[in-house]
Curated annotation (Swiss-Prot):
GO terms for molecular function: ATP binding; ATP-dependent protein folding chaperone; unfolded protein binding. PANTHER family: HEAT SHOCK PROTEIN 70KDA. HAMAP family: DnaK. Induction: By stress conditions e.g. heat shock. It comes from the Bacteria. The keyword Transcription regulation does not apply. The modification Phosphothreonine is found at residue 197. InterPro entries: ATPase_NBD, Chaperone_DnaK, Heat_shock_70_CS, HSP70_C_sf, HSP70_peptide-bd_sf, Hsp_70_fam. This is Chaperone protein DnaK. It comes from Porphyromonas gingivalis (strain ATCC BAA-308 / W83). Acts as a chaperone. Keywords: ATP-binding, Chaperone, Nucleotide-binding, Phosphoprotein, Stress response.
Length: 640
């Protein structure tokens, strides 16, 4: 069996590692460096440069030098509008509202650009090993959604790699950190702030098991954003002095970016740095120079919003894991941006202890990926990695409610099925609306896919049984299947790369879910009550029709009166009136049921009201057919 390499496909830099003699080795590239800039350049004559050669020529070729492409992976064009405005290269709206990089009229997908970086990493490994490499473990941010994971897998395939596993970056880092400590019981927090993304994961380690308890983060918070606060400050200062916005010139913008990144790095070890850019731009025919001093204090002031944005995800992750900061034994720093002193200070403040500096933040993720590769080949034994899915998943059901099938922070791989039914007689088709998020109502969550199940046999409402199955594999990629149990017909969907969530949407969902939890609960209870009334009306009318004149006249009149009252309350959607009418109807039905029971005789097994007679005692009664207590009433749309 060939080697499985581990690749950290980063926003700013990438790294490749391989297991040699049970030891992970970080492989040096052809330029003699252990990390490779995630930069691709297209130069005259059709030549393509990747890594350091591409980065070195960026100032003179800004519109054809592509960087931070990871931020575009699996996103729609609308979701990356902020990034489109920031970069000097041209990004246009492509098919299916996807972002495409325009190089002289040739449109490249983010997957294609990422594949070029992966090819560089593949070649680096092949040069070191002296053999062809065809398989890899590739890491992604823990908070990457299904579409972004799928896009990463596609990039690997384009690069000629069979992606054996997609692993979350903090989880890979924990594997590298804890492999030699696997006999100890530990609780660790992995704080991963890279070039473009931020993740926080809480894990338990012990007896070779690495179990993720919770994860949180922001897929658009990283070193790029820290660079941009410096860029904006430099540009605004220059504009106030010279009346010209340097951000409008691609070459000047590229010089600002490099200067900002250099200043940020220097301020991790010094209290101030001079930014000197001669001949930055001519103003009225006169060459102008940019010379400014940036102190660490000023930088921290400029970046304060970004620094504080790291706090809430950490607090949420601790809460979701059922832990307090005192429960955490070690805090591991991952990603180059964790070298910023203010970040280290905020981490210590959040967790109440100084973070461990025992791992290389630039290399530890790739090392963990290589170890996972060794687990897959059998070279590494007695290690079990248990990861989680970051967001809840479900479908839209009657009344616009999101019915969850898989909760956030569920260990993967996982599979969950539920039975649903129809709300219309003789409904031939249903539409399955797949949702992702934490809110109770469908409209407040993110729609990540829709598909139809056709060919349902004609039947009264609530009779068909549609089994919906959510299946998340070890890569965190979702498959949804709908199965009509009567006809055997099946339909499924794999969520495609353009349908995922943006970082802002994820953040908004969780914040709003917390702030509106009580309102959501009340609204859901209201909808549930209306649905119960609807089902009770249906079941009562069905029983009246089936039993006909078997009802004693003196018992039927109260039922008719209560039924009319319930219909009026249901039409008005008055919850209090519904409660009263349902209670009256249930009383009338019970009285009629007793009379029928006496008349028919228990021994004869006559027309007796079953346990669901007029049913509407709770969510599991009137909502469902009397012969199957596991069927949920769903307001599917009829597809004509």
């Amino acid at each position: 069996m060939g080697k499985i390499i581990g690749i950290d496909l980063g926003t700013t830099n990438s790294c490749v590692s391989v297991l040699e003699g049970n030891e992970p080795i970080v492989i040096t590239n052809s330029e003699g460096k252990r990390t490779t800039p995630s930069v691709v350049a297209f130069v005259d004559g059709g030549e393509r440069k990747v890594g350091d050669p591409a980065k070195r020529q960026a100032i003179t070729n800004p519109t054809k030098t592509i960087y931070s492409i990871k931020r575009f992976m699996g996103e729609t064009y609308d979701q990356v509008s902020r990034e489109v405005e920031r970069v000097p290269f041209k990004v246009v709206r492509g098919d299916n509202n996807t972002p495409r990089v325009d190089i002289d009229g040739r449109l490249y997908t983010p997957q294609e650009i990422s594949a070029m970086i992966l090819q560089k990493m593949k070649k680096t490994a092949e040069d070191y090993l002296g053999q062809e490499v065809t398989e890899a473990v590739i890491t992604v941010p823990a908070y990457f959604n299904d579409a972004q994971r799928q896009a990463t897998k596609e990039a690997g395939e384009i690069a000629g790699l069979k992606v054996r596993r997609i692993v979350n970056e903090p989880t890979a880092a924990s594997l590298a950190y804890g492999l030699d400590k696997s006999n100890k019981d530990m609780k660790i927090a992995v704080f991963d702030l890279g070039g473009g993304t931020f993740d926080i994961s809480i894990l338990e380690l012990g007896d070779g098991v690495f179990e993720v308890k919770s994860t949180n983060g922001d897929t658009h918070l990283g070193g790029d954003d820290f660079d941009h606060v410096i860029i904006d400050w430099l540009a605004e200062e220059f504009k106030s002095q010279e009346g010209v916005d340097l951000r409008q010139d691609p070459m000047a913008m590229q010089r600002l970016k490099e200067a900002a990144e250099k200043a940020k790095i220097e301020l991790s070890s010094t209290s101030s740095t001079e930014i000197n850019l001669p001949y930055i731009m001519p103003v009225n025919g006169i060459p102008k120079h940019l010379v400014m001093t940036l102190t660490r204090a000023k930088f921290e002031q400029l970046a304060d919003r970004l620094i504080q944005a790291c706090v809430a995800p950490c607090e949420t992750a601790l809460k979701d894991a059922g832990m307090s900061r005192g429960d955490i034994d070690e805090v591991i720093l991952v990603g180059g941006s964790t070298r910023i002193p203010a970040i280290q200070e905020i981490v210590e403040k959040i967790f109440g202890k100084a973070p461990s500096k025992g791992v290389n933040p630039d290399e530890v993720v790739a090392v963990g990926a290589a170890i996972q590769g060794g687990v897959l080949t059998g070279e590494v034994k007695d290690v079990l990695l248990l990861d989680v899915t970051p967001l809840s998943l479900g479908i839209e059901t009657m009344g616009g409610v999101m019915t969850r099938l898989i909760d956030a922070n569920t260990t993967i791989p996982t599979k969950k099925s539920e039975i649903f039914t129809t709300a219309v007689d003789n409904q031939p088709s249903v539409e399955i609306h797949v949702l992702q998020g934490e809110r109770s109502l469908a409209k407040d969550n993110k729609s990540i896919g829709r598909f139809n199940l056709d060919g349902i046999a004609p039947a009264p409402r609530q009779t068909p049984q549609i089994e919906v199955t959510f299946d998340i594999d070890a890569n965190g990629i979702l498959n949804v299947t709908a199965h009509d149990k009567a006809t055997g017909k099946k339909q499924n969907i794999r969520i495609e790369a353009s349908s995922g969530l943006s970082d802002d949407e994820i953040k908004r969902m969780k914040e709003e879910a917390q702030a509106n939890a009580e309102a959501d609960k009340k609204e859901k209870e209201r909808i549930d009550k209306i649905n119960q009334a609807d089902s009770m009306i249906f079941q009562t009318e069905k029983q009246l029709k089936e039993l006909g004149d078997k009802f004693p006249a003196d018992k039927k009149a109260p039922i008719d009166t209560a039924l009319d009252k319930l219909k009026e309350a249901h039409k008005a959607q008055d919850v209090a009136a519904i409660d009263t009418a349902m209670a009256e109807l249930q009383t009338a039905l019970s009285a009629a049921g007793e009379e029928l029971y006496k008349n028919a005789g228990a021994a004869q097994g006559g027309a007796q009201p079953g346990p669901d007679f007029g049913g509407a005692q709770g969510p599991s009664a009137g909502d469902q057919p009397s012969d199957d207590k596991n069927v949920t009433d769903v307001d599917f749309e009829e597809v004509k």
